[in-house]
Amino acid sequence: MKKNGILNAPLSRVIAELGHTDYIVIADCGLPIPPGVERIDLALKPGLPAFLDTLELVLADMQVERAVFANEISQHNPVIEHAATSMLDGKPIGHVPHAEFKQLSRGARAVIRTGEASPYANVILYSGVIF
């Protein structure tokens, strides 16, 4: 039995399988997940697990090179954006229109669906390398 880090087997596996520039999406409970993209559904009820809790644990396990948010988060969910940006600890951060964000999610290795029930609480995390 694994005793540290992410215990969810599919999520732990996806992170372990990432190569440089592969990416995953951490999503609120409303983001559409494209057909053919692996869905790791963590949602138990609205708000559980929270986007920020999930992001914190993923960042502890994953080597992140950069992140992308939808432009709309700045206006509609600045508290989540600020907290998530702080967690990313100086990593380059980009913003794209929400429609483009949804298009980008089609190329994700997986979309991790949280129970977050607040607008635009979604981020794309690009894998870096550990050397």
Swiss-Prot record:
Record-level Gene Ontology MF annotations: D-ribose pyranase activity; intramolecular lyase activity; monosaccharide binding
Catalytic activity reported: beta-D-ribopyranose = beta-D-ribofuranose
Keywords: Carbohydrate metabolism, Cytoplasm, Isomerase
Compartments where located: Cytoplasm
InterPro entries: D-ribose_pyranase, RbsD-like_sf, RbsD_FucU
The keyword Isomerase is annotated on this UniProt entry: yes
Coiled-coil stretches: none
Binding site for substrate: 28, 98, 120-122
One GO cellular component term noted in the UniProt record for this chain: cytosol
EC number of this enzyme: 5.4.99.62
Active site: 20 (proton donor)
Annotated PANTHER family: D-RIBOSE PYRANASE
Family that this chain belongs to: Belongs to the RbsD / FucU family. RbsD subfamily.
Record's function text: Catalyzes the interconversion of beta-pyran and beta-furan forms of D-ribose.
The protein's assembly and partners: Homodecamer.
Protein name: D-ribose pyranase
Species of the source: Laribacter hongkongensis (strain HLHK9)
Gene name tied to this protein: rbsD
